[in-house]
Amino acid sequence: MSTGIRHARWDDIPRERVTDDISRRLFTGERMMIAHVYLDKGAIVPTHQHENEQLTYILEGSLRFWIGDPAQGVEELVVNAGEVLYIPSNVPHKAEALEDTFDLDVFSPPRQDWLNGTDSYFHDKK
């Protein structure tokens, strides 16, 4: 009987290089996904939005976020180690690593663009 339960060690999950200064490991269920994300100091995650709800938990380092639509006003905030951020579905956001950073991102539903390699916004440094 298959229950769909899966188990893995993070160190056994391949680390995918996204850009020169960002890499990640992914673990996915049917309706959620968790990712270890590694950002070098100065790394930029360009402005983007997605249908997925997002939780970002900073394990080490810190990220500066710009959240919201520039036409309606953008909120800037810094999320440090030990802090967590919730980003609702379809809210534009951008991030910059203020130091070498290791974070845990949770998405629901899973980020199909991350799974199928169509996350081209990473290469647009705006």
Specify the residue positions occupied by each region the protein language model found.
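A cytosolic small-molecule/anion-sensing beta-strand core signal
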Residues: 59-60, 80-81, 99
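A short, N-terminal "cap"/entry segment at the start of jelly-roll beta-barrel domains
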Residues: 1-31, 35, 120-126
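Ligand-binding loop in jelly-roll beta-barrel domains
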Residues: 89-113
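Short histidine-centered beta-strand/loop micro-motifs
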Residues: 25-26, 37-38, 45-50, 67, ...
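Histidine-centered metal-chelating micro-motifs
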Residues: 44-46, 64, 84-94
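Short acidic-glycine-tyrosine-enriched beta hairpin
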Residues: 70-89
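Structural motif
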Residues: 33, 55, 62-64, 92, ...
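Short, conserved beta-strand element in jelly-roll/cupin
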Residues: 38-40, 50-65
